[in-house]
């Protein structure tokens, strides 16, 4: 039996905060792997600004050097909204001997009461919550918490900085920054 942490998100772009969360949860919970699952269309956000191909390429570059980090693009292959329930149902059907843990930030802990089919989802997985500045970890739902170093970082902040040609060194993996530059993503590198 393998124990797998799931880290979902738009990863637009994937940054060091994502990698920090994944590694800290993997170590604290002694998980075998962390699977990065980029969403197609998240139900709680507007569409992503970057294509699925670019996002998967950037994730792969970000996680390449870590043997316990894997990319799973199952949600990108699905049409429409990406609901966690559908993803976990598919994963448990495909990998019945695995135990799955779904990693969420404080922003999503607060949002749990509004999740699609939350009661059924709670029977299928264990949620692992990590702190995120500005959000509470208080919930009536069963969530295991992992204390991680917190940094005020989001993909939204990084996209804005890239568009404004502001300094982002040490916030993105170098390989992802090179990819952004080469493909002129987020307005970076355009005149």
UniProtKB/Swiss-Prot annotation:
InterPro entries: Cyt_trans-like (IPR004821), NadD/NMNAT (IPR005248), Rossmann-like_a/b/a_fold (IPR014729). GO terms for molecular function: ATP binding; nicotinate-nucleotide adenylyltransferase activity. It catalyses: nicotinate beta-D-ribonucleotide + ATP + H(+) = deamido-NAD(+) + diphosphate. Gene3D superfamilies: HUPs. Pfam families: CTP_transf_like (PF01467). This is Probable nicotinate-nucleotide adenylyltransferase. The keyword Nucleotidyltransferase applies. Belongs to the NadD family. Catalyzes the reversible adenylation of nicotinate mononucleotide (NaMN) to nicotinic acid adenine dinucleotide (NaAD). Pathway: Cofactor biosynthesis; NAD(+) biosynthesis; deamido-NAD(+) from nicotinate D-ribonucleotide: step 1/1. One of its GO terms (biological process) is NAD biosynthetic process. Keywords: ATP-binding, NAD, Nucleotide-binding, Nucleotidyltransferase, Pyridine nucleotide biosynthesis, Transferase. It comes from Oceanobacillus iheyensis (strain DSM 14371 / CIP 107618 / JCM 11309 / KCTC 3954 / HTE831). PANTHER family: NICOTINATE-NUCLEOTIDE ADENYLYLTRANSFERASE-RELATED, PHOSPHOPANTETHEINE ADENYLYLTRANSFERASE. Its EC number is 2.7.7.18.
């Amino acid at each position: 039996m393998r124990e797998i942490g799931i880290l979902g998100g738009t990863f637009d772009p994937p940054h060091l905060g994502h990698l920090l969360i994944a590694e800290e949860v993997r170590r604290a919970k002694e998980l075998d792997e962390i699977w990065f699952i980029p969403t197609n269309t998240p139900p709680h956000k507007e569409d992503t600004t970057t294509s699925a191909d670019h996002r998967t390429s950037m994730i792969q570059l970000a996680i390449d050097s870590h043997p316990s980090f894997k990319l799973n693009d199952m949600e990108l292959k699905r049409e429409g909204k990406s609901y966690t329930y559908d993803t976990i149902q598919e994963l448990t059907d495909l990998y019945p001997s695995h135990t799955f843990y779904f990693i969420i930030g404080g922003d999503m802990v607060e949002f749990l009461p509004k999740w699609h089919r939350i009661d059924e989802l709670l029977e299928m997985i264990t949620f692992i919550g990590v702190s995120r500045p500005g959000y509470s970890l208080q919930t009536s739902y069963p969530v295991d918490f992992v204390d991680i170093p917190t940094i005020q970082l989001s993909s939204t902040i990084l996209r804005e900085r890239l568009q404004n040609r502001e300094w982002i060194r040490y916030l993105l993996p170098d390989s992802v920054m090179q990819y952004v530059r080469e493909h002129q993503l987020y307005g970076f590198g355009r005149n």
